[in-house]
């Protein structure tokens, strides 16, 4: 039985207490030049917008990174452990991870992102396209301590490979 046939499990290690979130927003808005931390824009709509921005001709980092990985994927993959736990930090729509799965053949994909619903949808797509790979999503805020030990401990013998 494939583990990925079920919807991916989501772990949530996210969020300051609501009062702290409010304080964070107020502190930014009361600055001489008002600002809101970008993490507050990462809901479903914000994630979809960022995905579209990454596809613009003017936004070259995504294309540049993809070309580097394409040129060196085989050599990089050869240096990685067999059947790792592929941990994609800030996975977004998981498009970068999808490009690595054939080369890396991970035992499991752990997508980490701040937007829970978008993450769940992205991990479900990975699971549908790769039914033999277990998929887990971890919802967290990178401005807080990253807590993955308990998730990684579920698959001893499969070392993590962190990907960003």
Regions flagged by a language model, labelled:
Residues 115-116:
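Conserved SAM/SAH-binding beta-strand->alpha-helix loop
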Residues 93-105:
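Conserved SAM-binding loop of SAM-dependent methyltransferases across substrates and taxa
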Residues 119-126:
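Conserved SAM-binding loop
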Residues 146-156:
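Short amphipathic alpha-helix with an adjacent loop that forms part of the alpha/beta core around
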Residues 83-92:
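Conserved class I S-adenosyl-L-methionine
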Residues 34-80:
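Class I SAM-dependent methyltransferase Rossmann-like catalytic core
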Residues 131-144:
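Conserved SAM-binding strand-loop segment of SAM-dependent methyltransferases
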Residues 2-40, 47:
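N-terminal auxiliary segments of SAM/dcSAM-dependent transferases
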